[in-house]
């Protein structure tokens, strides 16, 4: 049985940006900010507060896919980004895009999908034997989430329809033709403001010592042989 102990606890953004440096990236659900209004989404992108904004600075090329066609139109007109496609990640076979990528980024998206297996099946054609699929999703056994739930203070994401433990995520990947090669837990965005930075300074050493309880799962996979 595969050893599923996380290799460590890290910054999700730092890990992804390092892995995607000088590589050709396909970013699924690139807009992010799912609980924000349309204007807030576009403002975050224009102000370079999104992961996709940072990917454009370090990657050799980035292609973005998102189902929010209206937001994509606004981003093209207000921010000037190109290489964007409006598509449903659960229907990628309908997308007129015929190439492979070094990295397929599937970050904080799988928990939003009614049929995640359809998305994983559709991703296969964008990968070759050397491509990496990077998935992140909330950890079902995250310590802080479990504490908040016990205290009646937990709030689920507005569009979340499922959750994953490391075991469930591995099973999902295997069922759809992927082999998990690395597993970490992580925190999502870099801390902003002194209060967040203080909280991180206190919490990060604990989660580095016990990464099983980190808030977000971060898995790297390849096509199964």
Descriptions of predicted regions:
Residues 2, 38, 67, 78, ...:
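S-adenosyl-L-methionine-dependent methyltransferase catalytic module, highlighting the catalytic core
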Residues 6-24, 34, 45-51:
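Conserved alpha-helix/loop element of class I SAM-dependent methyltransferases that forms part
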Residues 16, 55, 123:
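Class I S-adenosylmethionine-dependent transferase superfamily signal
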Residues 24, 45, 60-61, 132, ...:
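Residues at the starts of beta-strands that form the adenosine-phosphate
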Residues 28:
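Conserved beta-strand/loop positions that form the S-adenosyl-L-methionine
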Residues 31-92:
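Class I SAM-dependent methyltransferase SAM/SAH-binding core
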Residues 94-104:
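A short acidic, Gly/Pro-enriched loop at the edge of an enzyme's catalytic core
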Residues 103-115:
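A short SAM/SAH-binding and catalytic strip from SAM-dependent methyltransferases
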């Amino acid at each position: 049985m595969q050893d599923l102990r996380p290799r460590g606890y890290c910054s999700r953004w730092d890990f992804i940006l390092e892995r995607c440096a000088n590589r050709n990236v396909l970013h699924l659900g690139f807009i992010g900010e799912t609980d924000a209004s349309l204007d807030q989404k576009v403002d975050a992108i224009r102000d370079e507060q999104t992961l996709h904004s940072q990917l454009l600075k370090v990657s050799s090329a980035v292609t973005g896919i998102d189902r929010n066609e209206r937001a994509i139109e606004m981003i093209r007109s207000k921010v000037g980004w190109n290489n964007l496609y409006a598509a449903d990640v659960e229907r990628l076979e309908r997308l007129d895009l015929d190439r492979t990528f070094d990295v397929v980024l599937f970050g904080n998206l799988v928990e939003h999908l009614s049929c995640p297996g359809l998305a994983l099946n559709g991703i296969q054609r964008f990968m070759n034997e050397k491509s990496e699929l990077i998935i992140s999703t909330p950890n079902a056994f995250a310590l802080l989430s479990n504490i908040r739930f016990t205290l009646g203070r937990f709030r689920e994401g507005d569009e979340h329809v499922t959750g994953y433990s490391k075991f469930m995520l591995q099973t999902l990947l295997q069922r759809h033709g992927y082999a998990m090669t690395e597993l970490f837990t992580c925190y999502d965005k870099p801390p902003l403001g002194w209060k967040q930075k203080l909280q991180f300074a206190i919490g990060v050493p604990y989660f580095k010592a016990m990464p099983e309880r980190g808030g977000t799962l971060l898995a790297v996979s390849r096509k199964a042989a």
